[in-house]
A protein has these predicted regions:
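Signature of short aromatic-glycine-proline-rich micro-motifs recurring in repeat-based ectodomains
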Residues: 8, 51-60
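A flexible loop/linker signature enriched in serine peptidases of the S9 family
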Residues: 1-3, 13-25, 36-44, 52-53, ...
Length: 251
């Protein structure tokens, strides 16, 4: 049936079967009108989203920039930056994994898990796949966070007993580098050659002091005075300089 005919005096337009047509009375020719609607494509636009409330806790970009290790809802995922396959590398609904960190050589992903009842370090071989391997055991407190050494030979973590612990994930051994029972060691970071550490910790007067620590000699050296509140140390990429923040404006 023809519905809703309308004319401008020259042509007649009407609806039939859900489509619009135009009729030329002079020629009695009828033609379907094809309609294309422009759109702002609101739902196709890129959008920045806060996914923190949805369970994501950390992410680490692979050295080649092609994939990310993401921890979300207690699982570790190997996720492509662009198109590709997303892999759940833990599959452990009974435990909580977090702090996934890609090794600088791109071969491994290290993370913290509590499947044993205490937090331990785990290692996943990216190329080989398979199950992650537990590389520490019999831990006696909560691990705060971990990081790889730049040479990809060790994993460093801090814990609630205010220790800095260095782990050899391949030999499955660990050693306590330093412990400060009174205060938490903060801003811990390796030097680019993996031979030094830098960190900050409060002095007795509560001012934060920056230190460097030589791993070979096991010696600690203060970099700043206790009269200034200094923190957030980081090595320059060539390892020649130490950069930090310091509050030295007295008013």
């Amino acid at each position: 049936d023809v519905k809703f005919p309308s004319t401008n005096g020259k042509l007649i337009v009407y609806e039939k079967g859900g489509y619009l047509y135009k009729l030329d009375p002079a020629t009695k020719a009828s033609e379907q009108i094809h309609i294309s609607l422009g759109s702002d494509l609101v739902y196709a636009r890129a959008e920045r989203m806060n996914v923190g409330k949805k369970g994501r806790s950390s992410f680490s970009l692979s050295p080649d920039g092609k994939r990310m290790a993401i921890t979300a809802r207690g699982e570790v995922f190997d996720v492509p930056v662009g198109k590709g396959i997303t892999r759940n590398i833990t599959k452990t609904p009974g435990s909580n994994e977090r702090s996934a960190d890609w090794s600088p050589d791109g071969k491994y992903i290290a993370f913290i898990g509590d499947g044993t009842g205490e937090t331990e370090d785990y290692l996943y071989d990216v190329a080989a796949g398979g199950e992650p391997v537990q590389v520490t055991k019999d831990n006696d407190t909560y691990i705060r966070d971990l990081q790889w050494s730049p040479d990809s030979k060790h994993i460093l973590y801090t814990d609630r007993k205010n220790r800095i612990v260095e782990v050899d994930p391949f030999a499955k051994t660990k050693r306590t580098v330093l412990q400060c029972p009174e205060q938490e060691l903060r801003d811990v970071e390796y030097s680019p050659d993996s031979k030094w550490l830098t960190y900050s910790r409060p002095a007795p007067n509560k001012m934060s002091v920056v230190y460097v620590y030589n791993l070979a000699s096991a010696k600690e050296y203060p970099v700043t005075e206790k009269w200034y509140d200094s923190s957030s140390p980081t090595f320059s990429t060539d390892g020649k300089y130490l950069i930090f923040t310091s509050d030295r404006d007295f008013r």
